């Protein structure tokens, strides 16, 4: 069973989520794994669909929400690795990012997973930024 999303195409069920691998999204050059979380048996939830629509229409605002946490990941990395470019402000990170995945619950509850061009090739880590109640106060490093 599949659900056809108007932007993402065919989504497959995974537990209670609806997912797509390597989706082309209108707001980023990367092909992205996307999960619209906590759906029903036949389709993603209305709140997850609305959340994805909001993210797609407001990607610059999403970047603003997560950029301070991204900079907190960047600073110790830049201090430890001499080849990492030196950025003075959080907004300078954009353009060095690759969107890996999105997990969307609603307009103000979602996670964004990124990898950055300046990360060393031997570094397997991806960084997930958590937006909860419209605020990003945490991130985690996976890999």
Named regions from a protein language model:
Residues 1-25, 89-143:
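Acidic, proline/glycine-rich low-complexity IDRs
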